[in-house]
Design a protein with these regions (language model features):
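A common structural junction motif
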Residues: 88, 236-240, 346-355
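Hydrophobic beta-strand positions in extracellular immunoglobulin-like domains
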Residues: 74, 208, 330-332
Length: 456
């Protein structure tokens, strides 16, 4: 017998959708960029008030070197779920600033069936869809039949060590039957994606140093650290796009037969649309179609994110750089270990004659992955079929970086991810938006998940 009357819940969601969207707009107007203490405090207070109004026990818990974590709890039952989200807005890829001729980044406006604002998809809209699903179940049925916990962080990043400390201190309160992360959007075929994990990362600065100060370039007897750096960076990757760091691919988990049948066989081959949107003639290595999908999801990479040395800007500046620096990203896949990659990088540089090139680690986190045949992916696919006309598909990992691995040390709960979004949602730009109907569907899906978990 079903524990939750989903027809009544759906009707409540439909009646209250305009109010839900108004609340998302209101929350998106708070410019909660991680470095803005005043705005972050406002976003935190907004959430605490909302959770309190729903009847949750809500706490703001301090964290070292981070904005406070919010932990809210409601419901009772044999089963439990942890929702993981964040209330800060991504600012490190594309700064959230007002730009002439562009939409205000925190407008919160609704136009032509779309709600605009930085954070509307990543991650305020996704968070509120989960909150509104709980509100709808409570309003329609009078109770929440499972233990629901929200953990909302205020400092997202490549390597969030504060989360490691927080989970170590509070893991007993965070453990649940499952955790639902915030990663995944609709694909080109309008199917909701469910990510089974996250890629990992090792992000380093490579530094070559020369003289103790900048000298005029006429001193041609002096070594140029820019050349040293260029030669060192060039040694990391071959013309065939293979990373030359020894053992880099040794731990990469091969694509299994189960992944081929349960995951890759169902993925939309949207690589051609992606190539066209990016304005590219082709992808790295010339891959296309299904081969491109396998490379995207199952193969690690190396990216030069930036190089700096000496003079910049217009005009002639006849200088010899004092220092040269390259920002290097190793994006890792299961089962690579960032510590092992770092050690191999040091060995590679030393054996290549670049002992003087320094390595500064800026951040790292290992990848994470759950089995596609586990109970959680199966349940998410089944519940999505009730709400989404085109259903849902599994992705091996989210192509972004996440900290799911933090919970692995302290809990046994499986973690899968999904979020609001679609192929054209322009995430992390001033045009970031969600579609109104996507929001309605996601609220109903989360409610369906809660019902299925209660009946499990």
């Amino acid at each position: 017998m079903a524990t939750v009357d989903l027809a009544a819940v759906d009707a409540h969601i439909d009646r209250n959708l305009d109010r839900y969207l108004a609340e998302v707009s209101d929350f998106c107007r708070i410019p909660s960029v991680g470095g803005d203490a005043k705005a972050m405090a406002a976003a935190e207070a907004w959430l605490v008030a909302w959770f309190g109004g729903l009847g949750c026990t809500a706490e703001s818990l301090p964290a070292a070197e981070a904005n406070p974590y919010l932990l809210a709890e409601i419901g009772a039952g044999a089963r439990s779920v942890l929702f993981f989200n964040h209330y800060d807005v991504a600012d490190y890829t594309n700064p959230a600033r007002e730009v002439a001729g562009e939409r205000h980044p925190f407008s919160g406006t609704i136009e032509n069936g779309k709600l605009y604002g930085r954070g509307s998809a990543d991650d305020k809209g996704t968070l509120l869809a989960r909150m509104h699903a709980i509100e709808a179940i409570l309003a329609a049925t009078g109770g929440i039949p499972v233990q629901v916990r929200f953990l909302v962080e205020g400092k997202r990043g490549v390597s969030n060590r504060s989360l490691e400390t927080f989970v170590a201190e509070h893991h007993a309160r965070l453990d649940a039957d499952c955790c639902l992360w915030e990663a995944g959007a609709k694909d080109e075929r309008e199917r909701q994606t469910i990510s089974l994990g996250h890629k990992g990362i090792l992000y380093v600065d490579l530094i070559a140093r020369g003289t103790e100060r900048t000298w005029p370039s006429r001193y041609t007897l002096f070594p140029n650290p820019a050349w040293t750096l260029i030669w060192a960076v060039n040694s990391l990757k071959g013309p065939d796009e293979r990373v030359c760091v020894p053992g880099y691919y040794d731990a990469v988990r091969p694509v299994s037969e189960a992944d081929e049948s349960d995951v890759y066989a169902h993925l939309a081959d949207d690589t051609e649309q992606l190539r066209v949107r990016a304005g590219l003639a082709g992808f790295v290595g010339g891959v296309t179609g299904r081969q491109a999908l396998r490379q995207l999801y199952s193969q690690p990479s190396l990216t030069i994110c930036g190089i700096s040395a000496g003079a910049s800007g217009p005009g002639q500046k006849l200088v010899l750089p004092q220092e040269a620096r390259a920002k290097i990203e190793f994006r890792l896949v299961p089962d690579q270990d960032p510590a092992q990659v770092l050690a191999a990088l040091r060995t590679h540089l030393d054996t290549g004659g670049f002992e003087a090139v320094e390595i500064e680690v800026q951040g790292s986190c290992p990848p994470y992955r759950i089995d596609a045949k586990g109970w959680l992916p199966r349940m998410l696919l089944e519940t999505a079929a009730r709400v989404y006309p085109n259903g849902a598909v599994l992705t091996p990992v989210a192509t972004g970086i996440g900290n799911r691995y933090v919970f692995k040390e302290w809990t046994t709960m499986p973690i899968a991810g999904f979020a609001i979004g679609y192929a054209g949602y322009q995430i992390e730009t001033n045009e970031e938006h969600i579609r109104v109907e996507d929001y309605r569907e996601q609220v109903k899906w989360v409610a369906t998940i809660i019902a299925a978990l209660a009946d499990r």
